[in-house]
Amino acid sequence: MMTDELDTLLEWFDLKDELRTGWVLRNIDSPESVAAHTWGTASLCLLYAEQEEIDRQKAVTMALIHDLGEARTGDIATRAEEGRQTTPTSEKEAAERSAVTDLVGPFNDTELLALWEEYEARDTPTAQFVKDMDLIDNCLQALKYERQTRYDEAEANDHFAEFENLDEFFATAAPRLRTAFGQNLFEQIKSQYERELGRPCQL
């Protein structure tokens, strides 16, 4: 193993320590890392890809690298309210593309870079499926945190002034889902979230 490969591997592993910004802003106790989210997304692909006639290996591989760039850029959260988006989408995409290119470079694996580009374009059924599983993972995590009472509901939080509880994570996901399967999963998770809260989720 060359030195640049070792150094790059260690940078990949930074995802294990990079906390998911949305949960941090919501003051979730011990929030998940980007790597934990990646595992959740890959697991959903593993379980459901073939059911949706998607190549399982390709989907899982795409899921494993979909947030790789955040090892260098950090996790830039997508917000439901446009005015709360701190970094323009184009700037975020450019930074992540540069990071992924650098992080894959030492391994000379053009297939991984191509899969990441395919994911970002969202033009193929596989990319749309994986993106939906990325969003579904977030909704599942919101339901899990709500059940575990991992935040102080009564605490004033300027970052989430427009939404109660963890509604914003559902509101962020809802308009971005592209597949019927993803939308169906979303409705099931949201319905359970609503039953447990005893009120409709604000979207």
Model-flagged regions — what are they?
Residues 1-203:
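Alpha-helical, largely C-terminal catalytic domains
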